[in-house]
Amino acid sequence: MNPRRKTRLWVALTVLAGLGLTMALVLYALRANIDLFYTPGEILYGKGAAQEKPEPGQRLRVGGMVMPGSVKRDSRSLKVSFRLYDARGVVDVDYDGILPDLFREGQGVVAQGVLGDDQRIHAREVLAKHDENYTPPEVKAAMDANHTRPPQAYKDNRP
């Protein structure tokens, strides 16, 4: 192999290795920033055919209805705890911050945060349903499939 071809080969291999490393780092960074959507029942019993449950410490978004009578506010701080339910389960959510104006019992909300060891969601952000005309497709599908009875019909069925 002549020196010119050898140099081209090394340059090509170096460029390919650099691109591979760049892609690996980008994919790793994106993986760390993904928040998967779950319903309360999927958190408790698993999601999909494989019944995959989220791991404690995993970042996630959970969508459901705020259970009537479950909102507890701390009088000395902005801490709030409430329960989200769907047809398959109930999960507790803790939040420290100002709730949206449209947050109320019986309304649909999405809480974004981290799943704790105690199966509680420690939310960083709470989003309240703001418009009846638009709901993200995955939230609408989950709500239609899981909310067929009145709130009083759901029990605390945590494992």
From Swiss-Prot:
Regions of this protein lying in the Periplasmic compartment: 30-159
Single Gene Ontology BP annotation: cytochrome complex assembly
Keyword Magnesium: no
InterPro entries noted in UniProt: CcmE, CcmE-like_sf, NA-bd_OB-fold
Membrane-spanning intervals of the chain: 9-29
Binding residues annotated for heme, in chain numbering: H130, Y134
Membrane topology: Single-pass type II membrane protein
Gene Ontology molecular function terms on file: heme binding; metal ion binding
Pfam families per record: CcmE
Keywords: Cell inner membrane, Cell membrane, Cytochrome c-type biogenesis, Heme, Iron, Membrane, Metal-binding, Signal-anchor, Transmembrane, Transmembrane helix
Annotated segments matching region Disordered: 130-159
HAMAP family, per database record: CcmE
Function: Heme chaperone required for the biogenesis of c-type cytochromes. Transiently binds heme delivered by CcmC and transfers the heme to apo-cytochromes in a process facilitated by CcmF and CcmH.
Family the entry assigns: Belongs to the CcmE/CycJ family.
Protein's name according to its UniProt entry: Cytochrome c-type biogenesis protein CcmE
Organism: Cronobacter sakazakii (strain ATCC BAA-894)
Native organism taxonomy: Bacteria, Pseudomonadati, Pseudomonadota, Gammaproteobacteria, Enterobacterales
